[in-house]
Amino acid sequence: MTEGYKDDSDLCHTTAGLSETNLKRLALTEFDGGTRKGWQDTDLQLPVYKKNRDNEKFRFGEIYGRMFWDKPAPTITTRFYSLSNGRFGHPAQNRAISLREGATLQTFPLEYVFKADTISDISRIIGNAVPPELARRIGKAVLEATIENKAKGFAGGLFDGL
């Protein structure tokens, strides 16, 4: 998959297009977790970041970064498809992650169809969502606790006394 890819049969198999400058930035970012801190060409650094390049705190160091293959993914936000909004660069390809990749990281089933017509709307749905698997596990734990409390003869509700 390349930057700017669009699958007409499934909008989720879409990646954001990149400007020539952002393509250069990403090409110079190491695979598997690289950041813009390694860029030797400071003309590619945004002015706001230049003065902080060698600072220990390295302000906003995740922006234009690549994801890692073997580490937890960053928080999937509503703008995860955009390279300039966090560590959303693909670990080994010169592009940001696709909508489907973001949805998969959020634990949406691969066959899930998002009812939206734009990249922005779909990414907002994905980024604002409670991950479905997390919701399932919380619901299961609440149900099990309710059943257990009922079996023990507790008459009150699950949250009584809190």
Question: Which residues does each PLM region occupy?
Answer:
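C-terminal target-recognition/interaction regions appended to catalytic cores
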Residues: 1-162
